[in-house]
């Protein structure tokens, strides 16, 4: 089976790199997208979600990502996002605290001038981190 390289990059640098991927699954704005070697060149907007990388032997890596873009070429996928964490690096307790804070902000009185869009994004990020951490 042909292999595919993937790199996940944030403004702070490369977070994840793999050169032997068999399948990469991305959460795009239009739905889940599976990418294998030889995929047609594409640029896809990503939503908050998990990137799943299947390696030889059916080993899988899971990476929680925020919104961003994926540039897909026949032998390479470049994921550009604001933040990303590998499942092994996620502090579940910290993610649960973030979830509680986001829920509290969303439940505040509208007179408090809460930025609901920002609070909702924080809620989705926290939920995603907790879900991805389950794959450690």
From Swiss-Prot:
It is found in: Cell membrane. One of its GO terms (molecular function) is proton-transporting ATP synthase activity, rotational mechanism. SUPFAM superfamilies: Epsilon subunit of F1F0-ATP synthase C-terminal domain, Epsilon subunit of F1F0-ATP synthase N-terminal domain. Keywords: ATP synthesis, Cell membrane, CF(1), Hydrogen ion transport, Ion transport, Membrane, Transport. The keyword Nucleotide-binding does not apply. It is a peripheral membrane protein. Pfam families: ATP-synt_DE (PF00401), ATP-synt_DE_N (PF02823). InterPro entries: ATP_F1_dsu/esu_C_sf (IPR036794), ATP_synth_F1_dsu/esu (IPR001469), ATP_synth_F1_dsu/esu_N (IPR020546), ATP_synth_F1_esu_C (IPR020547), ATPsynth_dsu/esu_N (IPR036771). GO terms for cellular component: plasma membrane; proton-transporting ATP synthase complex. F-type ATPases have 2 components, CF(1) - the catalytic core - and CF(0) - the membrane proton channel. CF(1) has five subunits: alpha(3), beta(3), gamma(1), delta(1), epsilon(1). CF(0) has three main subunits: a, b and c. Belongs to the ATPase epsilon chain family. Produces ATP from ADP in the presence of a proton gradient across the membrane. This is ATP synthase epsilon chain. The gene is atpC.
């Amino acid at each position: 089976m042909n292999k595919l390289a993937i790199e996940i990059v944030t403004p702070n640098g490369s977070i994840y790199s793999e050169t032997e991927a068999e399948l990469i699954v991305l959460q795009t704005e239009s739905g889940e997208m599976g990418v294998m070697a030889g995929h047609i060149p594409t640029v896809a907007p990503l939503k908050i979600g998990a990137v799943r990388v299947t390696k030889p032997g059916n080993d899988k890596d899971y990476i929680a990502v925020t919104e961003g873009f994926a540039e897909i070429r026949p032998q390479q996928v470049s994921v550009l996002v604001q933040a990303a964490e590998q499942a092994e690096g996620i502090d579940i307790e910290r993610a649960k605290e973030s979830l509680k804070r986001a829920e509290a902000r969303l439940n505040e009185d509208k007179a408090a001038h809460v930025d609901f869009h920002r609070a909702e994004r924080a809620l989705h990020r926290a939920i995603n981190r907790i879900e991805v951490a389950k794959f450690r």
